[in-house]
Amino acid sequence: KKYNAKATFFVTGSHILNTKESDIVNLLKNGNEIANHNMYDIPYKNIPIKQFENDLIKTKSFLNKFSKNLPKWYRAPHASISDDMHEIIKKHNLKHVVGDVFANDTSIPDANWISAFILKNVKPGSVIIIHMPERGIREWNYLALENILKGLKEKNLEIVTLTELEQKSAK
């Protein structure tokens, strides 16, 4: 809210099962969107394609509890995707999203390095990948996000959802 930022949150089905519904509802009320990140945070490229599709559908049904008008976005866990997975994604009218700015925030526990890397590499239209901090998990991302949002504002870059980005680029 402080930076008038909106985002697309790629959510796994397993995360939905372990999150208070009110937290997801509040994300949506604040102008954010939620999108499909499949059931588990695993590299589905190594999983039978039928399980991939079943997990994709299951996650979509969980997400539909919060929004009947879900965005069409999908992001493969670990950015690992096969041709067969891509076909299934298209079959379900989803578009696979790949970010162009990722500071490996899951492995580098340094908020200043993460934010500096992102701010150095971001440009208008960039899709930044940063993982949600949680108590005890990736807590360094709280500070990284604060630094990034402040830096993006200083660069006069608007922080929008993927749907808004697509709409702006179509103009």
Task: List each language-model region with its residue ranges.
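Active-site beta->alpha N-cap acidic-glycine motif
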Residues: 1-43, 47, 51-65, 71, ...
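Terminal accessory/targeting
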Residues: 1-8, 25, 120-171
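A cross-domain feature marking catalytic cores of carbohydrate-active enzymes
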Residues: 11-13, 36-38, 76-78, 100, ...
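Acidic-and-aromatic substrate-binding clefts and catalytic sites of carbohydrate-active enzymes
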Residues: 11-19, 42-50, 75-81, 104-111, ...
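Solvent-exposed, polar/charged alpha-helical surfaces in well-ordered, non-transmembrane soluble domains
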Residues: 25, 54-57, 61, 83, ...
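Conserved, mostly hydrophobic/aromatic
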Residues: 34-37, 59, 74, 96, ...
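Basic- and aromatic-lined ligand-binding clefts that recognize polyanionic substrates
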Residues: 65-81, 85-89
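His/Asp/Glu-enriched short active-site or ligand-binding loop at hydrolase and phosphoryl-transfer sites
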Residues: 80, 86-121, 157-168
